[in-house]
Each structure stands twice: as structure tokens, then as C-alpha cells.
């Protein structure tokens, strides 16, 4: 059963990543529209602002994914420690 769970988590993670990628792309299009109206598209500052905005968006995405994975790891650790305590208590009660 754990194989199916791993596959579902993997597919779910890929779906969330694609959704986040689409959100970043949408933000980039809005930002590019704003920059093209205010700055010249071939100016140095346009390129700098665009690069910084892209880095910030990907940084936020990376931090969000890291936070989600850490929360999942903590939940799995808590579940494992609870099951170990239950196993120890059942062994002690059987002795």
C-alpha cells in the first residue's frame, strides 16, 4: 500500500509544482506588461528588474516547497514515534 501512497504523493507534488509554475508565469506576464509600459524593453534597468523579479519568484517557490516538505517530514516523524510508543507499551503489557 505504501507504493501507491508514494506514487500519489509524487503526482500530487508534480501537480502543485506545475500550478506554482503557472502562477509564476502569470505574475511574470503582469510584471512584464508593467515594465514595458514604464521602461524601455531593451534598457539595462528593464533587464535587471526582470531578473531580480524572476529570482524572487523562484526563491518564494523554493521556500514554500521546502516548508511543505519539512512539515510532511515532521508529521511522519511524529507518527513513527507514536507507533513506536504503542509497540513498546504493547510489548510491556504482554510481558
Curated annotation (Swiss-Prot):
GO terms for cellular component: host cell cytoplasm; membrane; viral envelope; virion membrane. It comes from the Viruses. Residues 77-95 have a biased composition (Low complexity). Keywords: Glycoprotein, Host cytoplasm, Late protein, Membrane, Signal, Transmembrane, Transmembrane helix, Viral envelope protein, Virion. Residues 1-22 form the signal peptide. Residues 23-45 are intravirion. Residues 67-83 are virion surface. It is found in: Virion membrane; Host cytoplasm. It holds the Pfam family Pox_A9. Glycans are attached at residues 79, 87. The chain crosses the membrane at residues 46-66. Residues 76-95 are annotated as: Disordered. InterPro entries: Poxvirus_A9. Induction: Expressed in the late phase of the viral replicative cycle. The keyword Transmembrane applies. It is a single-pass membrane protein. The keyword Transmembrane helix applies. Belongs to the oerthopoxvirus OPG135 family. Envelope protein. Required for an early step in virion morphogenesis. This is Virion membrane protein OPG135.
Amino acid at each position: 500500500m505504501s507504493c501507491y501512497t508514494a506514487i500519489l504523493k509524487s503526482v500530487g507534488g508534480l501537480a502543485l509544482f506545475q500550478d506554482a509554475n503557472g502562477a509564476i508565469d502569470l505574475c511574470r506576464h503582469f510584471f512584464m506588461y508593467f515594465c514595458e509600459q514604464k521602461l524601455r524593453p531593451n534598457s539595462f534597468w528593464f533587464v535587471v528588474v526582470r531578473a531580480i523579479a524572476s529570482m524572487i519568484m523562484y526563491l518564494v517557490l523554493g521556500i514554500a516547497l521546502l516548508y511543505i516538505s519539512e512539515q510532511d517530514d515532521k508529521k511522519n516523524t511524529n507518527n513513527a514515534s507514536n507507533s513506536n510508543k504503542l509497540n513498546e507499551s504493547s510489548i510491556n503489557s504482554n510481558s
